[in-house]
Amino acid sequence: MPKRDDINSVLVIGSGPIVIGQAAEFDYSGTQACRVLREEGVRVILVNSNPATIMTDPGFADATYIEPITSEVLEKIIIKERPDAVLPTLGGQTALNAAIRLDELGILAKHGVELIGAKVEAIQKGEDRQLFKDLVIESGADVARSHVAKTLEQAVEFAEDLGYPLVIRPSFTMGGLGSGFAHTRQELERMVADGLQSSPTTEVLLEESILGWKEYELELMRDTADNTVVVCSIENVDPVGVHTGDSITVAPALTLTDREYQHMRDIGIDIIRRVGVDTGGCNIQFAVDPTNGRLIVIEMNPRVSRSSALASKATGFPIAKIAAKLAIGYRLDEIPNDITKVTPASFEPTLDYVVVKVPRFAFEKFPAADAELTTTMKSVGEAMAIGRNYSTALQKALRSLEKRGSSFHWGAESRSVEELLETSRIPTDGRIVTVQQALRAGATPEQVFDATKIDPWFIDQIVLINEVADAVRDADELDAPTLREAKDHGFSDAQIAEIRGIGEQEVRDARHAAGIRPVFKTVDTCAGEFPALTPYHYSSYDSETEIVPSDRRKVIILGSGPNRIGQGIEFDYSCVHASFALADAGFETIMINCNPETVSTDYDTSDRLYFEPLTLEDVLEIVHVEQQAGELVGVVVQLGGQTALGLAKGLEAAGVPILGTSPSAIDLAEERGLFSGILDAAGLVAPRNGTAVAIDEAVVVAEEIGYPVLVRPSYVLGGRGMEIVFDTATLHDYFLRMADQGIIGEGKPLLIDRFLDDAIEIDIDAIYDGTELYVGGVMEHIEEAGIHSGDSSCTLPPVTLGRGQIQQVVDATRAIAEGVGVRGLLNVQFAIGAGVLYVLEANPRASRTVPFVSKALGIPLAKAASLVMVGTSIAELKASGLLPERDGSDVPMDSPVAVKEAVLPFKRFRTKDGLIVDSVLGPEMRSTGEVMGIDRDFPRAFAKSQEAAFGGLPLSGTVFVSVADRDKRSIVLPVLRLQQLGFEVLATAGTAEILSRNGIQARVVRKYSEEPAAGDSPSIVDLINRDEVDVVINTPSGRTARADGYEIRAAAVAADKPLFTTIAQLTAAVASFDAIRAGFDVTSLQDYAIAREARR
């Protein structure tokens, strides 16, 4: 069946901001879909609110809308663009829920738009817990005993029937949001309340406990002719009870017999048919009781999912690309396999290697959070590795996490076997290492299985790894057989060095002297049956290589590794654009990365892809292979965040050419003493500051500067470890915590700055070629200095800075670029306080705001910077038309305004008492993603950003106000405006008194900690929980008064109420209310570009 000729234009709905449970994998999926649809001659209209994505680049769609993903906005786009169809199955749960809402409101029928990729009935059957349960039972397959509840009362009643513990699973949510295991009625009531709140259909499934069962997934695809393929089987190493996104997973499934696999496959194919997915893919999860083999179906996703991206990267089978073709009418047997070019997509992939995915967590950002892993997903990223056996893939994946202690180690272990086993009973980040240590300390595999319920086969593999480590330790010398045995099981040179008590370079020298180097294999989808035509490689210590280096001029680009808070999709964006630009310039582009979620690890983003850990050893081996032919022009390290920058010195020491800013210049910017010299020479001012490597030094420096001080480690991203410290005792506590984490100490000094209160923070992204500075954009932060730039909302162009101040910022940036010796990208952060411009820090690399600037002003910063790194001048880039003559420092008055807003994951993290962690923002970054609002002025742009990030602001209702003493003067005008808009005002006694003096009538409510008066006197927390408050304004008052504020903020986050913790943020919101009332206009980036050209 050929492509449908009645579909000429398609509206693709993206997934919105990066959040836990829905991350960069949907940018990868959406980018593939947009590409293939355009290749098929379909006009693509895209809507997504996330500016950090590749898919929102104007080149991937004919009309690109960076707008909130709401029914109102989607209808306006449909009216304007008149698409024939809407494709929602590649944008995660966000897109699927949006499409269902369009159907329920009759918008699709009203405008004659078809839903493709999955019918509404199929989505309902797959997502509605009761419908799916009934369907599975009809098929003859087994499910856990369960009931669907729509009220708390129903849930309590059903729990009596099912018994404790039981599982709560909300409908139509992602990443297990609102789910969990309830062991008591108290836990049940809290979890059901959360689940009902999280579910758009206000329903939860209560299910018998299957804790400790083995968990599997199948990725399937089906077309309109009923051709069905199982793309990949995935097995969770962690048993049921840990969300699959938080579990170590392996593909293909390794502990199923062929009979068990075929049975699971048959069930999966029957379910996809019954659900009715006939133009795309789906993911089905199963559980198997290890005691008797009972197999049950857990749930399904009737769309491309997080696991689909992993399955695509694991197999080389592009699920999203094929799903897009199926959606416009093709059959599987009509779609060629990109990798072999001779087999169709109806051939199921075959693997002759093992793939392991390991999650990356960010509990260090939320120290109060309970670190136990449950059915609610908490990981913020993941790394993937490919090996010829499980032990190799596992060890490579663990070292890809780039976290201290994440790999297996063989140093001193002070804990006893009993302590290690007890620790391993609770699933946490790093449990696999605890298991390794327990086995090493003498625990038996049976004891480990009893504690963890991890399948014995996986435990035996760790026993094997420990045995190899013992052989390395006990060998008389580090000879070739010993080294080869270690390498065959994934040991790094650093691990071997630790076991032997020698240096890593000594191991590397011995290995090279013995002629032991990796070869590189190819991912081909067919286990070598057909030749692979796409260069997608992984390392192995087998004897035969499958690659031949080209004789071209080539550039290696180091990716940013697994996503984490502070280093996310924004850096992948820069890497991808560098690859595109350098390829267009005639270079062979070689990407090294280990993140399965990203566009950079798609097999057709670069000329050659190495799916490898970003460690010095692994990168050097790739460099060695590529230098065997052609010319390696250099390695790009300034686009992959701190991961890539951290390798610069080691690569340079090994004689590898570094493109762009040199490692010594990077040190000039990072090392406080050297950077101060540059500022002094340029006549620039920094806040009073100093450095320390010992606690006594730190105390002296802090007392000289004067409290409060801002403290942070060197060489970190995302403000990791950054805090505002008010006294010596807190400084002592801070220093010990950071030293324990190994991020400060000798060679890693602590940076101490005077904290600037009431200052405006400014960001600038620019390119410098050694002669000319080109400004990408100057951004003004909405929140005052003290909140990490990644968590602060910002506006481009600035809305309160004068031309003179902007020019001062540009001049200072030029002086810094020249002094440091930048070649390529530079990000500088400034603050203006009391009329003085302070330099906070300079980063000679890509920043997380590069995509935002590029989308807001239409300037391809990453592409231009990559060409500057290989010697192209800014003048040449202007002459070629890649860079506009007018840079981002000179934005016309009538230009649109763009606002970036951070999206925060507080609802995912709870304390051991079940409370949501405190949502107060500070100098350490906590956001997982971002959105952009763009419109003709700041109020409209800000309103859009709030709608996209938080679901918008209510136009009426009740507002609660409780602010710190320092904010009581500045709170009056915003609250007065809210009252004029019709809001009823509630306040605590102290705040109400101030408001009353200024003519604002506020009803006094008691604090959470105050004793109730006679009669019914609900606290503010009670009112929030009863849904009697619509907006919460609460600014923190310092540590001693935090208890009340914390309870208020936690209740607001749990109830999904708009929460303002800074006056600046509130003031911006109040200014946007008129814009919200007027409704949003929608404009594509392409239309903005046309208007921009007309102004030039």
Swiss-Prot record:
Signal peptide range in chain numbering: none
Binding site for Mg(2+) 1: 285, 299
Domain ATP-grasp: 133-328, 676-870
Chain sites annotated for binding Mn(2+) 2: 299, 301
Limits of the MGS-like domain: 951-1095
Subunit note: Composed of two chains; the small (or glutamine) chain promotes the hydrolysis of glutamine to ammonia, which is used by the large (or ammonia) chain to synthesize carbamoyl phosphate. Tetramer of heterodimers (alpha,beta)4.
Family: Belongs to the CarB family.
GO-annotated cellular components: cytoplasm
Biological process, per Gene Ontology: 'de novo' UMP biosynthetic process; glutamine metabolic process; L-arginine biosynthetic process
GO MF term list: ATP binding; carbamoyl-phosphate synthase (ammonia) activity; carbamoyl-phosphate synthase (glutamine-hydrolyzing) activity; metal ion binding
Binding site for Mg(2+) 2: 299, 301
Binding site for ATP 1: 129, 169, 175-176, 208, 210, 215, 241-243, 285, 299
Protein's recorded name: Carbamoyl phosphate synthase large chain
Function description: Large subunit of the glutamine-dependent carbamoyl phosphate synthetase (CPSase). CPSase catalyzes the formation of carbamoyl phosphate from the ammonia moiety of glutamine, carbonate, and phosphate donated by ATP, constituting the first step of 2 biosynthetic pathways, one leading to arginine and/or urea and the other to pyrimidine nucleotides.
InterPro entries in alphabetical order: ATP-grasp, ATP_grasp_subdomain_1, CarbamoylP_synth_lsu, CarbamoylP_synth_lsu_oligo, CarbamoylP_synth_lsu_oligo_sf, CbamoylP_synth_lsu-like_ATP-bd, CbamoylP_synth_lsu_CPSase_dom, MGS-like_dom
Species: Clavibacter sepedonicus (Clavibacter michiganensis subsp. sepedonicus)
Keywords from the named record: Amino-acid biosynthesis, Arginine biosynthesis, ATP-binding, Ligase, Magnesium, Manganese, Metal-binding, Nucleotide-binding, Pyrimidine biosynthesis, Repeat
Cofactor(s) named in the record: Mg(2+); Mn(2+)
Disulfide bonds: none
The record's free-text note on cofactor binding: Binds 4 Mg(2+) or Mn(2+) ions per subunit.
PROSITE patterns listed in its UniProt record: ATP_GRASP, CPSASE_1, CPSASE_2, MGS
Keyword Ligase among UniProt keywords: yes
Pfam annotation, one family: CPSase_L_D3
